[in-house]
């Protein structure tokens, strides 16, 4: 099965050929609905915007300027060198996602990440890893 164009995939612990858009949207909603996802309203809008833009095949359009004007309501003459709102909020969003996946999302089927250096999210299937302490000889 070929993967959908325009959707970046991150593979952990195995080969993933395709994650469905619907599965990713369900994971997005699961995160947004969770009381364990400690993000502000702005960070939630940011997260939802970048995921939906990526799923719509517009990952290449996700830039600091686009996020500043579409999510944070900055004017068309926005300058990220003098207004670091996007990078600051991206870092806070990354920390909120990390906390979510350490607590409520540790068993979620899909991990959504926003790697440092980009605002384009990646998606991967989480695979349970069996600990040696749970393996017994019979």
Regions picked out by a protein language model, each given a short descriptive name:
Residues 2-4, 22-25:
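Short low-complexity stretches enriched in small and charged residues
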Residues 16-20:
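A detector for short, charged/polar N-terminal pre-domain segments
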Residues 45-48:
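Pre-recognition alpha-helix immediately N-terminal to the DNA-recognition helix
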Residues 24-35:
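Short, Lys/Arg-enriched N-terminal segment that forms or immediately precedes the first helix
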């Amino acid at each position: 099965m070929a993967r959908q164009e325009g959707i970046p995939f991150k593979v952990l612990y195995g080969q993933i050929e395709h994650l469905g858009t619907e599965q990713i949207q369900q994971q997005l909603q699961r995160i947004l609905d969770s009381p364990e996802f400690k993000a502000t309203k702005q960070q939630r809008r940011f997260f939802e915007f970048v995921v939906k833009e990526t799923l719509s095949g517009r990952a290449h359009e996700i830039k600091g300027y686009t996020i500043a004007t579409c999510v944070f309501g900055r004017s068309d003459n926005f300058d990220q060198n003098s207004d670091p709102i996007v990078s600051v909020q991206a870092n806070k969003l990354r920390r909120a996602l990390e906390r979510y996946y350490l607590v409520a999302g540790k068993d979620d089927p899909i991990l959504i990440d926003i790697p440092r250096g980009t605002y384009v999210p990646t998606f991967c299937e989480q695979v349970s890893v069996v600990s040696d302490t749970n393996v017994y000889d019979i």
